[in-house]
From Swiss-Prot:
Cellular localisation: Cytoplasm
UniProt-recorded name of the protein: Putative glutathione S-transferase C1183.02
EC number: 2.5.1.18
GO CC annotations on file: cytoplasm; cytosol; nucleus
GO molecular function: glutathione transferase activity
General function of this protein: Involved in the oxidative stress response and detoxification.
Length: 220
């Protein structure tokens, strides 16, 4: 079933989970390479914030905000859900939304990724003090989810769900960059959870599992 078109890029933090979800639900979704604040005039007219990802359905339906897109994809393809990804009742649905909102709005936030992520990728000049201060702030924010997953294999129930697909894929922004070997030892439960979900979500289809020994900043 052709569902529509995603506008983003393949390795975008908030897009990988959508591509894998579409695959798991046998939904055909095209991907048009698009970058934030560099939308075409026509696309910018539809989505003036120019934030990724955005989606336009085959029927012209326009949708932004990643959690809304996850929900829409699942509703369209849940008859093909062979993995038990979705909720079985209202309680599970609420719990899945809770975890997705937590990682999206409380952990992967501008306050927690700027300016270190731009410096790490070489998009802006490296400055030691703001890099270290912002990276430390981000790592501190991960101490809470580290404790929350201490006694959990999965976030909701005893199976891999939408919450794990979403949560695990968003964690990559930290684990492939500022979480070095020393920091992984300080976040043992989150590290174990991330590696497990990386493989369960088949994220190696999109990029390798990267667990750096040390933090290496790209040269601009």
């Amino acid at each position: 079933m052709f569902l529509g078109t995603l506008y983003s890029f393949k390795t975008n933090t908030r897009t990988v989970c959508l591509l894998e979800l579409a695959k798991l639900l046998d939904l055909q979704v095209d991907l048009v390479e698009t970058y934030p604040h560099k939308f075409s005039a026509d696309l910018a007219a539809k989505f003036p914030l120019q934030k990724l990802p955005v989606f336009i359905g085959a029927d012209g339906f326009e949708l932004s905000e990643v959690i809304a897109i996850v929900k829409y994809f699942y509703e369209k393809g849940k008859h093909n859900d062979k993995e038990g990804l979705g909720p079985v009742n209202e309680v599970e649905e609420a719990e899945m939304l809770k975890w997705m909102c937590f990682i999206n709005f409380d952990i992967v936030t501008p306050q927690n990724v700027r300016p270190w992520v731009g410096m790490f990728r070489g998009n802006i000049p490296y400055e030691e003090k703001p890099f270290k201060e912002s990276a430390t702030r981000a790592i501190d924010s991960l101490k809470i989810p580290n404790e929350l997953v201490k006694d959990r294999t999965y976030l909701v129930g005893d199976r891999f769900t939408l919450a794990d697909l979403f949560f695990g894929s968003l964690l990559r922004i930290f684990f492939n960059s500022i979480i070095d070997e020393k920091t992984r030892k300080e976040l043992p439960h989150l590290t174990r959870y991330y590696i497990t979900m990386f493989h369960q979500a088949k994220l190696e289809t999109y990029f390798p599992l990267e667990l750096p020994l040390t933090v290496t900043v790209a040269k601009k």
